[in-house]
Amino acid sequence: PTLLWSLYNNDYDQAGSFFGVQAADRPLHAIYALDAGTVTLDNLSGTTQAGVTVESKVYDTSGNLLDDQNSATYSLTSQKVVNGILAPKVQTTSGAVSFVELLTKQNGAIVDRNVYWIPATPDVMASKTFGQPQASMSSYANLKALQALPANSSISATAVTSSVAGPAGSDKRVTVTITNNSTTKTVGFFLRADLRRGTATGQELAGDNELTTSIWSDNDVTLWPGESTTLTATYSSADLQGATPVVSVSGWNMPKIDVVAS
């Protein structure tokens, strides 16, 4: 409920919290429990799910793999929750930030992926506000290490448009594949794709060019070298106002790039 007013921006664009909530509601999902430092697995589907495992990977901000664990194999009945299946070994040195990547697999195939960034110095809530509608903090997490992430200029993207009927009167779908091609260990952190009005040569039009009415399947993703992800967005071709669809990809530690959604 505290995220209710943060799911969409005032221009209807999907904010980062939208995709966080969406991930948490996937049928099979692994969760890093901040209070316990362990992994919880849940089955929100209506049927039993068998052959389910979870792999947890811990990276530092330089891209070094610090910990890699695999769970036992589980069969979960509908609405089943299993706590403490893994305990990723995150950094505890003051000022450190760890990335935790959780890969949920069913019969060996990845069905869910989730990434957390965990500070060694966490948020501390003011105890007097427990149970109140608006809790306050007595101290904040130290995430300053993210400011020193190495730059990554090796993120690439492709975008393809197809005609397909979708929600809210949409008639087009753009499929975007983002890849981290870095030959070093550099992560691509919080990468976001946006659909924009542009030119046939891939330039964005001046002014307010984003199609905020487009609906994305996922966004704000984090990728390590060799990893890629595919996102889709549905939109109404009328919202282009005669322009060419162009997809921009930007991120915390990468320069913005634009590609034509041909």
What are the residue ranges of the model-derived segments?
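Eukaryote-biased activation of long, low-complexity terminal tails and linkers
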Residues: N253-V260
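Carbohydrate-binding surfaces of carbohydrate-active enzymes
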Residues: P1-N219, L223-A233, G242, V246
